[in-house]
A protein has these predicted regions:
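Short glycine-rich His-centered loop
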Residues: 3-23
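A broadly conserved detector of short glycine/acidic/proline-rich loop/turn motifs that flank catalytic sites
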Residues: 12, 150-151, 215
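Beta-loop motif signature
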Residues: 196-225
Length: 225
């Protein structure tokens, strides 16, 4: 049985910087967040597909085509906001209930980081929120959301994204929502293999060992039976 696949899309890229306010450049913020999301998911029984892993151009049309071709289990489109507001919001296609459920989980994880909630919002045709990556859910049936964690031009929000550690936490929030939505299990941890072919913790007969205490001299060869 194939593993669930999560498509992670960092918004903008290349010659499209997205929202910019001083040192806060959306394309860079989204990439760091997306990579952190992928890294967290490496611990779970799933596959990830990245729209981009470097600062390259990545159009909405390209991402929609990739989703259509690869048929992932869900889509996480990562963005940051601008325009003077404050807080986080998550968009979903207004007629797609599974996407709404995913949006609720993503928003809940964002709020756990201490961010102000602006709620989940509908993406629909005929509005300025007609997002392609949300819209494709209606044709593919794949749960898809577009998240906006913070406003790059708001001082309070800037304080929540001003370090790699904080961006990593945002990426992990997206990942945790995906884990919850898909019911993913952690990968089994393989026990470490002992070096030299022996059993872990075993001492070969005739080995020279150091023993603390008065009974044996340090470095003395012991006869082990």
């Amino acid at each position: 049985m194939s593993k669930p696949t999560i498509y992670i899309a960092a918004g903008h890229g290349g010659n499209d910087p997205g929202a910019v306010s001083g040192k806060y450049i959306e394309k860079a913020l989204t990439l760091k967040t997306a990579l952190a999301c992928q890294n967290y998911l490496r611990n779970y029984e799933c596959e990830t597909v990245m729209a981009r892993t470097t600062d390259k151009s990545c159009t909405v049309a390209y991402k929609m085509e990739e989703v259509e071709k690869k048929r992932p289990s869900l889509v996480l489109e990562i963005h940051y906001n601008a325009g003077g507001g404050e807080g986080c919001e998550v968009y979903y296609w207004h007629t797609h209930a599974p996407s709404k459920s995913l949006a609720q989980k993503v928003l809940a994880e964002m709020v756990k980081l201490g961010q102000k909630s602006r709620g989940i919002k509908e993406s629909k045709a005929g509005t300025s929120y007609n997002f392609g990556m949300c819209r494709q859910a209606a044709t593919t049936g794949i749960p898809s959301i577009l998240g906006e964690y913070a406003f790059v031009d708001n001082a309070k929000d800037q304080a929540k994204i001003n370090s790699d550690a904080k961006l990593r936490a945002v990426g992990e929030a997206y990942a945790k929502a995906a884990v919850s939505y898909l019911g993913l299990k952690k990968k089994a941890v393989e026990p470490a293999k002992p070096s030299g072919g022996g059993s872990a913790g075993a001492i070969a007969v005739g080995s020279t060992v150091k023993v603390s205490g008065a009974k044996y001299a340090t470095g003395q060869t012991l006869s082990l039976i």
